[in-house]
Amino acid sequence: MSLTVQSPVSGVVVALSDVPDPVFSGKIVGPGVAVTPDAAGGGEVSALAPISGTISKIHPHAYVITNDDGHSILVHLGLDTVSLGGSGFTVLAEEGQRVEAGSPVINWSPAQIESGGLNPIVPVIALEGNESDLEPMSPDRTVAAGETLMTWA
């Protein structure tokens, strides 16, 4: 049975190989896809849980959710955003908490990240996944938060 991975944010789909960070583009942490978030309005938006499961790791700029079958999805909010020390992010959940797909996990402002000189792109990674098992949405397509971003066989 395949796992449907929802987009944590609304925006435009980007191939992981086009993410301007070698850790992600080189698939060092795993295969996946990315989304350039829609920063319209410049306000805070919620980054959603891409799957139902347990939050196994959470930081202000990133989180991992593991489902009951042991599949883990990493959502990383922007590049080099760890350098912000949590500024611009509001964590809404905690490690060990069970969440349903589509539940808000972190509020953040992609426009604020961008105005600070950082890239707000959001890599969504299948940790310990095989690229051949993933079917990501095609690049350059618009995706809404909560819509299917990729499937993991």
Task: Please annotate each region the language model reported.
Residues 1-153:
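Contiguous, well-folded functional domains in the mature portion of proteins
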